[in-house]
Amino acid sequence: MTKKRFTAAVLAGILAVSSITGCNLMDTQSTTADDSDDETKEKTQPATDEPESKTQEGGEPDTKEPGTEDISTPEVPSDEETPTAEPVTDEPTTPEETTPEETTPENPGPGPGPEVGIDDGSLAAKYFALMQLSVEDARKEFGVEEDKSLKAEDFDKYLYDLFVDSVSGSYLSMIEYVDDPASFDIDVDSLDFTWGHTYTTAEDLKEGKDEVKSYIEELLAYPIDGLSNRQKLVYDKYYYELILSMWGYDVMPFSNYLNPRDDVLSNIGIRLYEVVFDEKKDVEYYFECLKTLPDFIEELPEGIQYQIDNYGYAPDESMLESHRDILVQLCDDTDENVLIAGFDAKIDAMDISADDAKKYKEENAKIVREEIIPALKAYDKELDGITGITDAVAPMCSYKGGRDYYDYLIEAEMSCGMSVQELLDYLKAEVDDCENELISIAQKDMDAYYAYVDGDFEYPATEADEIVKYLLEKMGPNYPELGNIDWKVAYLPKVLEQDGILAYYITPLLDNDKLNVIRVNGGANDTGLFGTMAHEGFPGHMLQFNIQKRAGSYYVENTFTELGYSEGWAMLVDRDAVNYAGFNKNLARIIQLDDIIGYDIEAILDLGINGLGWGADEVYDFLSGDLGYSYSKEDCEGIIMELAPYPGNLISYAAGYHLVDETIKGYMEENDVTYKEACEAFLEIGNAAFHIVAKYMGTDFTK
């Protein structure tokens, strides 16, 4: 999915970031349908400000809260150099639960670090080292003996069972991936239909880490010799996912449920709308799940207060206000309520009798009006009793344990094994190169420059389905073939249209993947729709999913979420689409460079502010000193307040683009292959950390 980046504009041959303090960070091109903590892997992947979900590769940043993720889709880390791995311990570094003083920017939670072993980079270094271990060294580290009796066919069964177990954790997990549960021997009636819990205790973290260690030991018992190339790839992928997950249990689970990025209620209408109704039984299961929503809502105040009291991470007043705006919409007692209108639209699309349709609509409306709305109204009143709400959220690294969490978050977003400082320096160098190129082009071709500044250009297609057809025709010859698949553009019901969503790709259910759907918000401004259709459709996420499937991927691979890989690819083709729009090549390059620089600058500021503790002086030095932009110290204070609540928001889009671009170009040069061949080799691997991509790119997966 796509996210809208920090606004950038070309002025007098020098790029200038436009009024950052007025930039709405959540005003994205599109947004993932599900950014909730329960399932960061949404089934729908919108073009948005966020992170992706199972909505194709992406939604909000596709990261999960430690303690809530499926074991097959762990989290990710990032930081300092990679020394020899330290012995794995059972105890998480999370401090004991305490009740801190009120959290404010001046007193951000239970004691800012660093302390010995906390917020000093050593935790990230430890996990980077574990991620890079060979299978043999990993066995020594975890005290595991190879079981030579296990064969390749046993590993196949292991991977199949792993997938089934991971999606059988709850009804909400299962419907993200499976159309026919019976074909996987999943008893739907026995599933957990609840929406999960709203907070994670220290005990939960310890239990979660112990469980992950047991999964690591189980994996490492399988011999690597004798496996097929695809099996070896999945072996490495899953080991990485598990180490990342263990790291996630070793950091404090900072979460802000009133933050638009983490808000558990903001996308609930779209999430429920994407539940597939193939038969009447699906509607009945939907009702069973819907009826548990009030219990989750009732627990929310406790979860928010627990987060504040034990981790010192509190929402601010503006978030509370925005959250209450969402509650107003959800409490709408008319038929235009998103939980009623969206459901009615789904029922109208079913092949059932008029009597059954009427019955289902009435039952849904009754649940919403008599159970969910009263629970939401009671919750709204409970919000008044929450203590510790701040005037402004402080940068993540200013909280005790915050830097360790941020290191983990960045690796979870990027899967590249680079420290915060390394990523920041890397992006700074990219910005310098892009700005120099931009200035050079603008000086040589002022007509192209003014055409861009004045918006004096038009894309060759403006309707979503027309754009996808155009891109298939024009970009198709230079990219891997999509194959003989069915796809369609479908529009959200009017009542579900949201400002934050432009479009998203709905990842097909794995046992019924014939139809690929790109969901579009017809009420959104169509600016950027051309690139968004490339990002979500062809040659973006839709091609990504189908090439991985064609390469013989295992079901469980679809539960792995490496946003640096998936969003990096989607951003690459999003920008490449401009080259096929019929523009003067200099105008096309100016459009691309401005977009790249805008994303990169915001990512750099995020890394500096939330990761390294930049204050107004450091922000000023970067924007006014390094880049030569006109910003005051007061402006820079405003930038910090804008970015502090959204750690890691754009990093997978910004840095992911550059790493994917470098990976493909490097492979072309080293192997003397075409761009199309390099893209196919990249996409056949599927979601993976970049060191795994480098290891397996070009492998023959038929062997």
Regions found by a protein language model. Give the residues of each.
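C-terminal motif of bacterial Sec signal peptides marking the signal peptidase cleavage site
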Residues: 18-22
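Bacterial Sec-dependent N-terminal signal peptides
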Residues: 1-10
